[in-house]
């Protein structure tokens, strides 16, 4: 009996030791992945390469990226698109593995902020929406970087201080289901959305902050808020932050009109014969997706290499060809079904383009539309 008890105790001790060893192994792995002290910071790498000739600069980045072996990207780019972009990068640089976390724009910010507060800096680059990218800057988590590729980009597509650079742009349109709304009765401007006949028949996203801020700037804060409050009284459907989801619900007849829909997806569905069409309102706003280089990047060479590649002729062309996204680099050809979106100049919605602060915009948006228990 004593022998049996001792044997059981010995087995329990060995099991506990094994579990404890496993825990410590995972802790060590996490520290190794997230510890920014293992190598040069992004700022140090940028300082080192800033005076190099283009060929030498590229070689330095490639050699550093080979040593680092990976780049970690947090993004809000759609599930159908971002894997194609990352795969194209890996084809160009097979020695750099891309690891990605995908969420909503606000979800990306929450994760980066939570990890930073815990002292874990896993992310190298964030590719997300303007308001959320600006929030990361305000949290002092972004390091300024002016890519040499910026010289070939459209005016207004990068921050002069280097805290963000757009890599694509999505025009904002009013989409409507052509089985439910005829071409003749479809709204022609924002005031038409306040007509009683559209009450309960329209949708809006829960995080359309950039569109909201652009209209407040155009109308003026007071008049803009009056308009938005009137719009909120139209019993809008607000199923979530995804424009793609709202367009799919529109096609299914859940709503007749989608306000602030992303034009690229709408134009794509239209080109495939879906019962959908769109209007280009004034202001014809367009929302960019932005790159931000993280201050505590643990793979800075690979991060800068990815940043430059996505803005390059090769990266922008492959992004456009593979996903249909609208490039911000001059001279890139776009798919035929996008041409209708490109026939009119659009207002580039960036953090610097708005007079209101990002927190004020998000707070007002939540309050006006009664989101998250708020109402103003």
Question: Which role does the model predict for each range below?
Answer:
Residues 39-72, 91, 194-200:
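Immediate post-signal peptide segment of exported/extracytoplasmic ligand-binding proteins
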Residues 72-87, 98-116, 120-254:
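Extracytoplasmic ligand-binding site segments that recognize negatively charged/polar headgroups
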Residues 175-180, 216-218, 287-300, 318-319:
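A bilobed periplasmic-binding-protein/Venus flytrap-type ligand-binding module shared by bacterial periplasmic
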Residues 155-156, 169-170, 198-207, 228-233, 237-240, 310-333, ...:
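Periplasmic-binding protein-like
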Residues 334-376:
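Extracellular/periplasmic bilobal clamshell ligand-binding domains
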Residues 131-135, 256-275:
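A ligand-binding cleft/hinge motif common to bilobed small-molecule-binding domains
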């Amino acid at each position: 009996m004593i022998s049996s008890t001792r044997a059981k105790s010995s087995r329990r001790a060995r099991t506990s030791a094994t579990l404890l060893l496993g825990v410590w192994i995972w802790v060590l792995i996490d520290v190794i992945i997230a510890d920014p002290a293992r190598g040069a910071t992004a700022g140090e790498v940028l300082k080192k390469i800033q005076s190099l000739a283009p060929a030498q600069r590229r070689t330095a980045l490639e050699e550093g990226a080979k040593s680092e072996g990976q780049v970690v990207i947090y993004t809000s780019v759609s599930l159908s698109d971002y894997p194609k972009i990352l795969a194209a990068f890996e084809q160009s640089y097979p020695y750099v593995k891309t690891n990605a976390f995908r969420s909503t724009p606000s979800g990306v910010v929450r994760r980066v902020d939570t990890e930073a507060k815990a002292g874990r800096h896993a992310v190298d680059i964030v590719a997300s929406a303007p308001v959320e990218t600006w929030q990361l800057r305000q949290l002092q988590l972004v390091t300024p970087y002016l890519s040499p590729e910026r010289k070939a980009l459209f005016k207004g597509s990068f921050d002069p201080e280097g805290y963000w650079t757009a890599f694509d742009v999505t025009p904002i349109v009013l989409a409507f289901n052509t089985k439910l709304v005829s071409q003749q009765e479809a709204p022609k401007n924002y005031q038409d959305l306040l007509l009683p006949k559209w009450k309960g028949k329209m949708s809006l996203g829960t995080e359309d902050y950039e569109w909201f801020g652009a209209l407040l700037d155009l109308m003026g804060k007071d008049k803009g808020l009056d308009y938005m409050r009137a719009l909120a009284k139209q019993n809008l459907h607000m199923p979530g932050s995804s424009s793609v989801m709202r367009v799919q619900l529109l096609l299914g007849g859940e709503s007749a009109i989608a306000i602030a829909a992303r034009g690229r997806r709408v134009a794509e569905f239209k080109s495939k014969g879906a019962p959908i069409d769109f209007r280009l309102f004034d202001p014809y706003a367009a929302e960019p997706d932005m790159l931000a280089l993280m201050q505590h990047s643990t793979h800075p060479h690979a991060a800068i290499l990815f940043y430059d590649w996505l803005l390059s002729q090769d990266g922008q062309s492959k992004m456009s060809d593979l996903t249909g996204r609208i490039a911000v680099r001059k001279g890139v050809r776009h798919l035929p079904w996008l041409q209708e979106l490109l026939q009119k100049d659009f207002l580039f919605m960036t953090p610097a383009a708005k007079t209101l602060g990002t927190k004020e915009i998000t707070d007002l948006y939540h309050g006006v539309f009664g989101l998250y228990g708020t109402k103003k």
